[in-house]
Amino acid sequence: FARRFSTLDHLTGGRIAWNIVTGYLDSGARGMGLDANRAHDERYEAAEEFLAATYQLWEGSWEDGAVRRDRAARIFTDPSRIHPVRHDGRHYKVDGIHLAEPSPQRTPLLYQAGTSKRGRAFAARHAEAIFLNGQTRPILARAVRDIRDAAKEFGRDP
């Protein structure tokens, strides 16, 4: 997954984005190899873990300067600047290097649309853009304020 997004980011010149959806349909879960969908909070737990692993691949596997592209010396990379990622979690395992060189953004622009308390916390921690709905301006303003406050709690500058 991380490699696909890195590849797309290269192909688009750094314009790829990811709308992170935890899913709610059993059919979607079966498409991911599960018998049934996870419970609501467990879906966010799995999403947190998935992002932790992909962040490590995007941001921690290849140091700046690892790609040399020295044709004369026939050296593409400096292997001492490429590191394996080891993630052994409850839902996912990763053991190896990121299989694509760093892309223009390294980490794509992240969108999220969670409306539950857990979903908004997830969005506040990770997303650069959040889909919101609200019947009135005051309702929407309150949601924006709550998410901005939560983002600050995660050390982010909304």
Place the predicted regions along the sequence by residue.
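Residues at alpha-helix caps and immediate loop-helix transition turns in enzyme cores, especially N-
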Residues: 1-4, 143
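Short, solvent-exposed amphipathic alpha-helical segments in soluble enzyme
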Residues: 6, 127-128, 146-149
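Internal, glycine-rich beta/alpha segment that forms the wall or movable "lid"
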Residues: 3-126, 154-156
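Catalytic cores of nucleotide-enabled group-transfer and carboxylate-activating enzymes in metabolic
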Residues: 117-118, 132-134, 138-140, 145-157
